[in-house]
Structures are given as structure tokens and as C-alpha cells.
């Protein structure tokens, strides 16, 4: 699975979808033009919310052939990697703060033949990633405190994104994908791309207005990248 870095990719976060018709939501967001399906897995312990497990991921896999980007916001993620791989994950991202042996877990994910990602919370320094970049395919920067959708981006995290992009360049790891999650909208999309984001996770800004707006909302995000007048000042 190869993700082209020439243009930013939009990952639709189903955390903001209607869970009562989740399969249909995945199908609709696929047709609307999302590049990636972003799936937040929460355990109610590492983050203050509970979402879905591997059985649900497996049940929606047939509704889309797009990349399934599974973000494990759970303690001891290594215990669940196999289950989510078998459920159809194409990318599995673990939190650096939630795993005592992140390098081992990342190596295990890569050995399954899928992409391995590592994520850090807003309070975690980007320097903590320096030793781990050799072992991951993707870095996910949380622009908000994880657990709930609909939050506003924490401005300092955009500088962190820029710093991580520079760190990746310094280490000559330019194939590593940079993903951002939290408060992504038409007003900050372009600035986040300029700061280094390859994949931008969007939930509320896609789903909130209902199915009829999915395609338009995704197009608006893409078009905002081409305009400079909509940039937020972080």
C-alpha cells in the first residue's frame, strides 16, 4: 500500500459518523471522495471515551476498499494489533505514551505487511520521537487532547508539526507520512499542509451537516488548500 505524498490526503474520521448506520456511513463517505477511512479506537482508560473494537471494524470492512487507518488510543496496544490486522486495518497507529515497548510493537506491525504509525499527545514533546523514526511509517500529531471529536486545534501543535517535519528531513526519513488529527477545517487546512501534513483527519467538518453535504465538505477542504486567504494565524 503506497500513499502518494504529492497532494494532501483527507482521512474521514468515523468518530463523527452516525454509529447506528455505520456501514452505510462508511460507504457514503467513500463515494463522497474521502481518501482514507480513519477509525478511532478508545478504551475509556488511556482516553476518557469508549468507541469500537475489532468486530465493528471487521463488519464495516466490506463497505469500502479505501485505506482503513486504525488509531489505537488504548493502553497496551500490542495486545490488540493482531485483532485489528485481521479485521482489515491497513495502517495501525499506537500512542507512544501508551506502550512500554513501542519499537517492538511497531516492528511487529510492519512485519504483518501493513503500515505502522506512532502518535503523540499535545503535552508530549516532539523530541520523544527522535529515537523512534527509524521504526515507523507514519507519525500522527494530535492537535487536540484525544478522546472526543469537535474540538478546536491547539495552536502550539502546528509548530510541533513543523518541527517534526524538519526532524524527519534531518534524519533523511522523507518517506514517513505526517498525519494530523483535531479541529481540521477549511480555515486551517492549508496552514497545516504548509506546516508539513500529508494526511489530515477531518470529522466534524465533514459529517456535521449530513450526508448530502459530505461531497461538498470534502471538496471545500481540498479547495481551501489552493487558497491562501483562508489560513488561520497560529
Regions found by a protein language model. Give the residues of each.
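N-terminal amphipathic alpha-helix/helix-capping segment at the start of soluble metabolic enzymes
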Residues: 1-16, 23-24, 229-234
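N-terminal active-site wall of soluble small-molecule enzyme domains
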Residues: 41-111
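C-terminal helical cap(s) of enzyme catalytic domains, especially alpha/beta-barrels
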Residues: 109, 193, 207-234
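Glycine/Thr-rich beta-alpha phosphate-binding loop at enzyme active sites
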Residues: 43-51, 55, 122, 130-162, ...
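Catalytic cores of alpha/beta
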Residues: 26, 78-86, 124-136, 182-200
Amino acid at each position: 500500500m503506497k500513499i502518494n505524498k504529492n497532494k494532501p490526503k483527507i482521512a474521514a474520521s468515523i468518530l463523527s459518523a452516525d454509529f447506528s448506520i455505520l456501514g452505510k456511513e462508511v460507504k457514503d463517505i467513500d463515494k463522497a471522495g474521502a481518501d482514507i477511512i480513519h477509525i478511532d479506537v478508545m478504551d475509556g482508560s488511556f482516553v476518557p471515551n469508549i468507541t469500537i473494537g475489532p468486530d465493528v471494524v471487521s463488519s464495516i470492512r466490506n463497505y469500502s476498499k479505501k485505506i482503513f487507518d486504525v488509531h489505537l488510543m488504548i493502553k497496551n496496544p500490542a495486545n490488540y494489533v493482531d485483532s485489528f490486522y485481521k479485521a482489515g486495518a491497513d495502517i495501525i497507529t499506537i500512542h507512544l505514551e501508551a506502550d512500554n515497548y513501542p519499537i517492538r510493537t511497531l516492528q511487529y506491525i510492519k512485519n504483518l505487511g501493513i503500515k505502522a504509525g506512532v502518535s503523540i499527545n499535545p503535552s508530549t514533546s516532539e523530541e520523544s520521537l527522535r529515537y523512534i523514526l527509524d521504526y515507523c511509517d507514519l507519525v500522527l500529531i494530535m492537535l487536540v487532547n484525544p478522546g472526543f471529536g469537535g474540538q478546536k486545534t491547539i495552536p502550539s501543535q502546528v509548530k510541533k508539526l513543523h518541527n517534526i517535519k524538519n526532524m524527519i528531513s534531518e534524519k533523511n526519513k522523507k518517506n514517513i507520512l505526517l498525519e494530523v488529527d483535531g479541529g481540521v477545517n477549511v480555515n486551517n487546512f492549508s496552514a497545516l499542509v504548509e506546516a508539513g501534513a500529508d494526511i489530515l483527519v477531518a470529522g466534524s467538518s465533514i459529517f456535521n451537516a449530513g450526508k448530502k453535504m459530505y461531497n461538498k465538505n470534502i471538496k471545500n477542504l481540498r479547495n481551501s488548500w489552493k487558497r491562501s486567504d483562508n489560513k488561520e494565524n497560529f
